[in-house]
Amino acid sequence: SYGSTPYKKEEARNLFPIFYSIFMKCGDFRRTGSAELDMCYVACGREHGYIERDLKPWDYSAGTVILREAGGVVKNWKGEEPSYLKNEDILACVPQFEENLLKELL
């Protein structure tokens, strides 16, 4: 699933080519509108990955705990640990998708 950063529509020109590239390599995209819900969907196996730019720490902190407890991966788009003190571009996924998704995001 993905988040489209609706508060910064000017970034669509940069984001949509990334979404398109990933979409062409996967079954489908979903958008619930909730970062925490999407991360929980990855944790329970309904989704394999979730990406979104510019999330606030309260948008991804709880989902990070849940997903990691389920064996998932949460990184920023540089492949680093999120700071939890600032907005981050978040990748949340099952471990086997981490490398390929990071290549798309870098």
Language model segments and positions:
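An extended, acidic
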Residues: 1-106
